[in-house]
Amino acid sequence: MIISRPLCGFVFAGLSFAVILPAQALVAADNQAARAEIRRTGFGVPHIVAANERGLGYGIGYAYAQDNLCLLANEVVTVNGERSRYFGPDKATLEQRSNMASDLLFKWLNTPEALADFWKAQPPEIRQLMQGYVAGYNRSLDEQKTKGLPRPCAADWVRPISTDDLLRLTRRLLVEGGVGQFTEAFAGAKPPSAQKPLQVDSQQVQALQLAAVRNQRFALERGSNAVAVGHELSANGRGMLLANPHFPWGGGMRFYQMHLTIPGKLDVMGAALPGLPLINIGFNRHLAWSHTVDTSKHFTLHRLQLDPKDSTRYLLDGKSIAMGQQQVSVEVKQPDGSLKDVPRIIYSSKFGPVVQWPGKLDWDDKFAFSLRDANLENDRVLQQWYSMDKADSLKAFQDSLHKIQGIPWVNTLAVDAKGQALYMNLSVVPNVDAAKLAKCSDPRIGTELIVLDGSRSECNWDISAEAAQAGIYPSSRQPQLLRSDFVQHSNDSAWMVNPAAPLKGFSPLISQDGQPLGQRARFALDRLGSLQQAGKVSAENLQAMVMDNEVYQAGQVLPDLLKFCASELGDDVARLTPLCAALKAWDGRADLNSGIGFVYFQRIMTSMQGVASRWRVVFDPQNPIHTPSGLAIENPQVASALRAAMLAAVDEVAKAGLSPESKWGDIQVSSLSGKPIPIHGGPAGLGVYNAMQTIAGKDGKREVVSGTSYLQVVTFDEQGPRAQGLLAFSESSNPQSAHSSDQTEAFSKKQWSELPFTEQQIKADPAYQVQVISEEGSR
């Protein structure tokens, strides 16, 4: 039973009254039933207190299921490879992958043997957290079944979960930066037939084309911004952090906000991904941190030289080796509702599974391609985040990343109360240096996709005794920077984290220097430079970096667009005058009240991306913040392309049914709760720090699917952390919940909230409610 503040001294447990005990008394011994206290504050955020890990996990699983039962149940179906069984093979996942391809990947990835090995590698604390989570989730499921499951998941695919399900979810997270990007290429890999030439149906071609786009946009769609400000630059002389991860607003990568406490051992608040009984991004009494998706490589492809006598054998150092053949069977729902087992052979080399991408990674009589994912051997990820959660100093925090090396595919930025700002690119990266890359890869391919020679053992990953895992870089050879002014990151390489101390000379698989920066990084460095010149940086300054919604690229090219409008319209003046008027009236932002000029600007710049000569000032590695810039409208080729882009933009806006009076808030919305809520922000590629990814909706609207998610600005004073934050898509994914849209409304209005952290702050919250649960009480 949940009770509010006036009654917080007592709860009902069955028919008896029970005093709410201090957390130390919630569990008397490890072998007794788990108990947890769940205190909810504004927006339904749970503050969970328990005496040990099992009790804490119990509270996390219970609270999460209260808010997101359907979401997690659906993800459990996915990672078990059962989507074709329940929904049919031709339907698509939330990520627009075919159910069949997804099922094949997860049946292969999450074998009983792999799960057993992963579980065996977990420390007792992690096992207890997961066991408690399972018990808490299943208790909430039982309670909700009694009342009636939420409509979206009132179906037979919702079931109690096990610790194996949590392991499956974790392993899915690990391969997001590797083999998970090759789902279609993995599922479609078949040896060439001797009887007929390689044939690929149109549906597979389309799926692979979509996969190629996803692969290229991985860092964008799983992107982030983060700024860590040190004592030299912060307004109060202490550490200050902005966390602005850009993650999906639904599915298995949707953040959940919570506060976890084991008195005397753990006190951490922030956000976590589904199924994880710990905090991924957050703060504790001593420090605050965030992550940004890195540009490092977390897998390599290996070109196999095939045995001329058998295309399922490959040559390694001149010796013929048979590919491994693993049969995977997927249950598939038939049109009549019956189930049929569909078997598939997954081929692999010593490096990993064979993948086939027609026209890119062909499996023919001469060659095939095998993928080695470094994170497949990373069983340290949960231990890593839990160690970070417990860190009582920045040194302890940094040491844990050096020792455990469990971060899969993100950078880490952190500050402490003393005002030290730290950047670490310490993720799991294959140990392949520039010399080996030059010797073992085809230079024509470049470094976007690393393809090594799979016919020579010397081209395999190097082994370092310092590394936590065979074949990856030791942390001592990866980028890191400790500053007293600032470090920042927005999904570029590590080299311009702080222009005063460029990070150079690393393996191309880790970080490449001298490369153009993305528009968000240029915006951040420009803004921080201006603030640095003006004096100090405040928490309000960091909030404004996100919330003022400046379109940074507009400052570089809008004057040229308006100049073109004034003198180059020619015979198209009648058609283009409304567009030019809208551009002139536009405020250069992605705010709710920004005019239709922003829509025109987006369409124009999207069209111009393919024009190589569009920049008047090309990229200069000596001036990466301010180059490239300016549209070269004096170039006839650029002028012609610009005219075509403008005309196309006019047609597209008209087709969408938008009027000259349309505002950005009328167009970009979130309808997750069932009603459209206006959402500010815009495309990351235009330099909008408050990045949003959208898909086409009804009536010309754009529906947000990814972008700014969990926001926090953390500062410190004598009492500890002071934090403000928001969860842009709200705490619950259940449209019927009171907390399915409340924070989304607040985000729309740019209303940050104080995040209650201390006991006094939590209990003083106007929405304070408390619930005590125990395994004994659920029997």
Swiss-Prot record:
Active site: 224 (nucleophile)
Propeptide cleavage-removed residue intervals: 202-223
Key words of the record: Hydrolase, Periplasm, Quorum sensing, Signal, Zymogen
Subcellular location field: Periplasm
EC numbers: 3.5.1.97
CDD domains in the cross-refs: Ntn_CA
Secretion signal span: 1-25
Compositionally skewed regions (Polar residues) per UniProt: 731-746
Transmembrane segments: none
One GO term (biological process): antibiotic biosynthetic process
Enzyme class: hydrolase
Major subcellular site: periplasm
A GO term from the CC aspect: periplasmic space
Chain positions covered by the region annotation Disordered: 731-752
Origin superkingdom: Bacteria
Misc remark: AHL-mediated signaling mediates quorum sensing in many species of Proteobacteria, regulating hundreds of genes, including many that code for extracellular virulence factors.
Similarity section: Belongs to the peptidase S45 family.
Oligomeric and partner information: Heterodimer of an alpha subunit and a beta subunit processed from the same precursor.
Its job: Catalyzes the deacylation of acyl-homoserine lactone (AHL or acyl-HSL), releasing homoserine lactone (HSL) and the corresponding fatty acid. Possesses a specificity for the degradation of long-chain acyl-HSLs (side chains of 11 to 14 carbons in length).
Protein name per UniProt: Acyl-homoserine lactone acylase PvdQ
Organism expressing this protein natively: Pseudomonas savastanoi pv. phaseolicola (strain 1448A / Race 6) (Pseudomonas syringae pv. phaseolicola (strain 1448A / Race 6))
